[in-house]
Structure formats: structure tokens, C-alpha cells
């Protein structure tokens, strides 16, 4: 369903068990947003602060966890769900948007930085996709947003971009965001791919992933590629991003903090020199 043009065809999710049925359309090129169309009584969950606009008749409610527990879940289940989000560094709370009006209503969610929104229909991937902890944007209510545990300590603590991964499970649509250009790769059985940890966005549950330390002291100290790779072994599908947010932020900070005062033709440096009288 994912395309490279400015918008997408309307997608439909047939909620088999738990997830609400939703329609959607993605707009834009490099600064995208997704518009969700809800029938009366349908809901969508989203990260706090992701909402762009919503029609009159949409009720917004902040909840513990993701609201995927059957029958609303008890206090223990809600605390467990919220605690899992806390481990990934996310907020304890999520926001639910429900159509309580008459007829179809729209609510939209915007990407936090330049890149692409990737719609994922979970039943196409055996009901489970693992993604970077900051990638999740929104999903049909009923989709569970949890964490993916790894037995090896190194994966959780030495992954650079954050290799405590989020786990999306259910039978509906989920939407994730990634920076720059998105590359989708299908790995054959046993095929191995080494990826910068920050460039990994998501993978299907058949893909085995781990952390591998960069070999060679010269590569470690002078390669500029970080100390670790993510190793991905098929079969399955992986989504990669060309511009991780931490890489973008580092470049902006380095240019604004140091090179702006150097005589390199920097606009910031020139303005600063004029103000200082240099």
C-alpha cells in the first residue's frame, strides 16, 4: 500500500477481532501527514502531540497505555501497558480519538520531522511488526503497542539509536514514521544484512535481529560509523531510513555550535560577526 507519490489510495482495514476499522489517506511529500476517517463509534490511538486537526464530533481522551485490553482492562493491565511504554522512553499516556458524532469524521496526525509515513496492515505480517521506539505515530484502536524483549543485554543497552524496540500487534492498521527516504527490503531465508542501528525502522517477526560490534580499532575510532551494527537475518521484510533523527539533530547542532563562528562563508557566522563588530 505504500507509494512514493504525494498521496495514497484510500485503504480499508477489516477488523477481524479487536482493531477498529479505519480509512486513511496520506498527504504530502517530505513533510507528510495521515488523515484518518472514522465511522461513528470508531477510534484511533496516537502518540501525544501528534494530532494536526480533527472534525467537530471527535472526542479526544488521554489514557494509560494503548487501550488495547479487552473490555477496557483492569488497573493492573493498564499499569503494565503504561510501564512498558516507560521502558522505551515514551510517555506513560496515549491519546484516543473517537467519533462520537453523526456520520464520518476525520482526524489527522503529522510526522514530527522530514520523512515518510508508512502504513502497515498488521494481518499481512502475521499480526506483528517490530519498530524503533520513536517510529510509532498512530494506529486503529485495538492495536497493542508494547516492547520487544531481547535475551542479550547488549541489544538493549548498546544499540545507539535505541535497540529497546517497540512491538505492534493486532489485526488493524498501524502507521509509523521514518526520516529521509524509506527503503523496503525483503530478506530471503538465511540472508544477512548489516545496518547502522539508527537506520533500522521496522522489521517483521520472522527476521532475527542482534547487535554486532564493529571490528578493527581503526574502524572504531576513525570510521565515523558508530561502534555497533544491527545484524538482520531473514526471512522477512525490513524498513530502513536514510536520515535517522539523531543524525539530523547532530548535524544541525554541530553547524550551529561550532562552524558558525568560523570563516567558512556561514550565514550565521557572518551575521554574528556583524553584530559583534568583527
What are these regions (language model features)?
Residues 15-278:
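Composition-driven recognition of glycine/serine/threonine/acidic- and proline-rich low-complexity segments
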Amino acid at each position: 500500500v505504500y507509494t512514493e507519490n504525494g498521496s495514497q489510495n484510500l485503504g480499508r482495514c477489516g477488523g477481524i477481532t479487536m482493531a477498529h476499522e479505519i480509512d486513511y489517506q496520506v498527504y504530502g511529500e517530505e513533510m507528510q501527514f495521515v488523515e484518518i476517517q472514522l465511522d461513528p463509534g470508531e477510534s484511533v490511538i496516537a502518540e501525544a502531540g501528534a494530532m494536526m486537526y480533527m472534525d467537530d464530533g471527535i472526542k479526544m481522551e488521554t489514557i494509560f497505555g494503548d487501550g488495547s485490553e479487552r473490555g477496557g482492562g483492569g488497573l493492573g493491565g493498564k499499569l503494565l501497558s503504561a510501564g512498558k511504554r516507560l521502558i522505551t522512553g515514551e510517555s506513560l499516556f496515549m491519546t484516543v480519538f473517537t467519533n462520537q458524532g453523526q456520520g464520518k469524521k476525520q482526524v489527522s496526525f503529522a510526522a514530527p520531522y522530514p520523512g515518510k509515513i508508512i502504513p502497515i496492515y498488521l494481518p499481512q505480517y502475521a499480526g506483528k511488526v517490530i519498530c524503533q521506539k520513536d517510529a510509532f505515530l498512530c494506529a486503529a484502536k485495538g492495536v497493542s503497542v508494547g516492547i520487544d524483549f531481547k535475551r542479550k543485554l547488549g541489544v538493549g543497552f548498546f544499540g545507539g539509536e535505541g535497540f529497546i524496540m517497540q512491538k505492534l500487534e493486532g489485526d488493524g492498521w498501524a502507521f509509523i514514521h521514518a526520516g529521509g527516504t524509506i527503503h523496503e527490503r525483503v530478506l530471503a531465508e538465511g540472508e544477512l544484512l548489516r545496518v547502522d542501528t539508527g537506520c533500522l525502522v521496522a522489521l517483521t517477526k520472522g527476521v532475527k535481529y542482534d547487535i554486532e560490534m564493529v571490528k578493527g580499532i581503526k574502524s572504531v575510532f576513525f570510521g565515523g560509523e558508530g561502534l555497533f551494527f544491527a545484524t538482520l537475518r531473514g526471512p522477512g521484510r525490513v524498513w530502513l531510513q536514510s536520515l535517522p533523527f539523531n543524525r539530523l539533530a547532530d548535524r544541525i547542532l554541530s553547524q550551529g555550535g561550532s562552524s558558525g563562528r568560523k570563516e567558512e562563508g556561514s550565514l550565521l557566522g557572518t551575521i554574528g560577526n556583524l553584530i559583534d563588530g568583527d
